[in-house]
Amino acid sequence: MSDGAVQPDGGQPAVRNERATGSGNGSGGGGGGGSGGVGISTGTFNNQTEFKFLENGWVEITANSSRLVHLNMPESENYRRVVVNNMDKTAVNGNMALDDIHVQIVTPWSLVDANAWGVWFNPGDWQLIVNTMSELHLVSFEQEIFNVVLKTVSESATQPPTKVYNNDLTASLMVALDSNNTMPFTPAAMRSETLGFYPWKPTIPTPWRYYFQWDRTLVPSHTGTSGTPTNIYHGTDPDDVQFYTIENSVPVHLLRTGDEFATGTFFFDCKPCRLTHTWQTNRALGLPPFLNSLPQSEGATNFGDIGVQQDKRRGVTQMGNTNYITEATIMRPAEVGYSAPYYSFEASTQGPFKTPIAAGRGGAQTYENQAADGDPRYAFGRQHGQKTTTTGETPDRITYIAHHDTGRYPEGDWIQNINFNLPVTNDNVLLPTDPIGGKTGINYTNIFNTYGPLTALNNVPPVYPNGQIWDKEFDTDLKPRPHVNAPFVCQHNCPGQLFVKVAPNLTNEYDPDASANMSRIVTYSHFWWKGKLVFKAKLRASHTWNPIQQMSINVDNQFNYVPSNIGGMKIVYEKSQLAPRKLY
């Protein structure tokens, strides 16, 4: 298969062998256009973003990305089923949210994951995209490994010992592309473990692991609960055992020094992603009331007046036992956003989990209890945006505040009695300040959910640079409407995960019966990875008189985008949906 070939469901990738001949001359790269072999480059390093302006306001965006990837041999050649147990923390009343207990399969493979915006776009690219375009369509994806180098490490007998590095022309790099998505899907952006965001800095793939079924019970408690919390292991249900190995499920290709590997092209089937936000809440839908009296002079204290008595107005409501028509009671066409139990932890047979909700800005974002919005909070290290000269292990963190404004303000919610009466007495209305179950500081908006068939939702925004780009559709009969981690959800199939592993490089002392650990020569690899991600975008047209806010720099943040005097760099998150649009 040559470069640019279509990668169908179940299609096999292309492997180009570029080993040197006895004379030292390399063979021609299959489709790559360059010669190969030891000491001869066989590929190109390209991190340019190309914008091709088409007809009718469309733009084709080709994002090229290249990285030098370093890979050590695995600690063990074995698959391991590992239980993570922190019952010492959850044994204390009120500590349910500290629960980390789970079981995972740790594999000897590593995952090359490019599924994050920062892998593909620099801040300048992102500025051009969000300032000039209104929507993105995800078109295609391809990736390649080339210029493979494998080296062995030995130590001299001198004191102190000296490490010696030698090229090993017969060692192998194992590469597997799961084009059928047979393996568990494990996007690494949720752990900030994708390829790094700086093209000039080497990066590493993440060790590949996946969840294994494990039942347990954790009974909720608070600090005043008497007795020790119930925390019980139940083990693995034999009906649910699924142990996957790459070696017997995915074709594995063996590359040696100078070899290349190409996946071919995957074409996406996804709905487009908007680069605009909506501001209309339910109070801004439809025709406003007619004003009988308009202001006669300028000034913020001069108001208009509806004029008609509230119980004599015309219109439609869903309020029984009253004739009052107000901006609060008139019937709106649908529910924009929804009140979500945004600090709700659900219980599952494998432990508690925070309920995911769709992000959407709530009010002025002044106080935590006004933000019923699910804005994602990212923690990341020096490969993914933290200042590269930072010392210590504490990650950097940002909260991405989505621009989609659902207008939620939980402090102002209330529930009326039936039949509706005005004014209401204390036993006719439930306010956020009313205690539930004798508790204070908890109101019904923590448990109240207005999601339903009348709910209007925006998809999640692109989060630059740390956010995930695409996600895999659930294999269920009923599909979720949005996925909260990524704006693009692949229908039917998504790009196959790319796995790599340094093959076992054995010594003459290997005895399969002697030990579970192989006697191996210390071997590592580095190789060049490159990819191409293609989008189509629609140029944004202006339909308003006023100019709008756009992404820019100023005197306060200009140095976020340039290195310090010792090379310190960081990447700050950027808004992706600055331009407003009406939704009705």
Swiss-Prot record:
Instruction: Give the UniProt keywords, A-Z.
Output: Capsid protein, Clathrin-mediated endocytosis of virus by host, Cytoplasmic inwards viral transport, Disulfide bond, Host nucleus, Host-virus interaction, Magnesium, Metal-binding, Microtubular inwards viral transport, T=1 icosahedral capsid protein, Viral attachment to host adhesion receptor, Viral attachment to host cell, Viral attachment to host entry receptor, Viral penetration into host cytoplasm, Viral penetration into host nucleus, Viral penetration via permeabilization of host membrane, Virion, Virus endocytosis by host, Virus entry into host cell
Q: Which GO terms describe its biological process?
A: adhesion receptor-mediated virion attachment to host cell; clathrin-dependent endocytosis of virus by host cell; entry receptor-mediated virion attachment to host cell; microtubule-dependent intracellular transport of viral material towards nucleus; symbiont entry into host cell via permeabilization of host membrane; viral penetration into host nucleus
UniProt biased composition (Gly residues) = 23-40
Location comes to: Virion; Host nucleus
Positions of disulphide bridges:
490-494
Q: Show the SUPFAM superfamilies listed in the entry.
A: ssDNA viruses
Q: What is its main location?
A: virion
Query: Quick check: keyword Disulfide bond in the entry?
Result: yes
**Superkingdom field:** Viruses
Q: Which InterPro entries match?
A: Capsid/spike_ssDNA_virus, Parvovirus_coat, VP1/VP2
Q: Which residues bind Mg(2+)?
A: 180
A single Gene Ontology MF term assigned here is: metal ion binding
Q: Quick one: where's region Disordered?
A: 1-41
Which terms in the GO cellular component ontology are assigned?
host cell; host cell nucleus; T=1 icosahedral viral capsid
User: Is Metal-binding tagged as a keyword?
Assistant: yes
Quaternary structure per UniProt?
Answer: Interacts with host TFRC.
Describe the function of this protein: Capsid protein self-assembles to form an icosahedral capsid with a T=1 symmetry, about 22 nm in diameter, and consisting of 60 copies of two size variants of the capsid proteins, VP1 and VP2, which differ by the presence of an N-terminal extension in the minor protein VP1. The capsid encapsulates the genomic ssDNA. Capsid proteins are responsible for the attachment to host cell receptor TFRC. This attachment induces virion internalization predominantly through clathrin-endocytosis.
Q: Which family does it belong to?
A: Belongs to the parvoviridae capsid protein family.
Domain comment (free text): The N-terminus of VP1 is sequestered within the mature capsid. It contains a phospholipase A2-like region and nuclear localization signals that might be exposed by capsid modifications during virus entry.
Question: What more is known?
Answer: The capsids of autonomous parvoviruses expose a proportion of VP2 N-terminus and part of that sequence can be cleaved of to form VP3.
The name of this protein is Capsid protein VP2
